[in-house]
A protein has these predicted regions:
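Short coil turns that delineate tetratricopeptide repeat
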Residues: 30-31, 64, 93-96, 129-130, ...
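Helix-start (N-cap) detector for alpha-helical repeat units in TPR-like alpha-solenoids
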Residues: 26, 33-34, 67-68, 98, ...
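Conserved structural position within tetratricopeptide repeats
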Residues: 58-61, 90-93, 125-126, 156-161
Length: 174
């Protein structure tokens, strides 16, 4: 009887202590643009690249200063792609802290500063410890540095927060 009560108590405690996955904040002036952006992320995660590209572009037609859509969006025109990234960088300080960090991670990567990227990914996790996305980003940066054991731990933490994190599961499978 005591074992059953202990087991039930443990289940109740673990159910009550479940961490809610908090998405990284995204700033846009328009709800429809946000919906296109979210749709683009789903398309890209499923390998539907043309649909993802179109959804990012739809978001940018509605809100041309949408930082994350500018950071992640692309076209077949490299000049336009550069303009997207420049717009993201120019507007990063008007966006959320998470968006600023993500843009700075991209900038550091473009400049070949992998240590800075890792430092920024750790900052993202410190500021957003309940976000599976933050742990996936950290895992990606650790993997980039060939620190595979730590990257696996980061992906596992993302899965602990969100057992349905496609990006974390996909990264672990690589």
């Amino acid at each position: 009887m005591f074992k059953k009560l202990l087991f039930i108590g443990t289940l109740l405690i673990s159910a009550c202590t479940k961490v809610e996955d908090v998405p990284l904040p995204v700033t846009t002036s328009n709800e429809t643009a946000l919906n296109f952006y979210k749709q683009a992320l789903v398309h890209v995660s499923q390998g539907e690249w043309p649909e993802g590209r179109e959804s990012f572009q739809s978001a940018l037609r509605i809100d041309p200063n949408f930082v994350m859509a500018n950071l992640y969006g692309w076209t077949n025109d490299p000049v336009q792609n550069r303009k997207y990234r420049e717009t993201a960088a120019a507007n990063k300080d008007k966006a959320s802290e998470a968006e600023r960090i993500m843009v700075e991670m991209w900038q550091a990567g473009r400049e070949g500063k992998s240590d800075k990227r890792l430092e920024l990914a750790k900052e993202l996790v410190e500021k957003y410890p309940s976000s599976s996305e933050a742990y996936v980003e950290l895992g990606n940066m650790l993997r980039e540095k060939y620190n595979f054991d730590e990257s696996i731990k980061s992906y596992e933490k993302a899965i602990e927060i969100n057992p349905d994190s496609y990006d974390a599961w996909q990264a672990l499978a690589q």
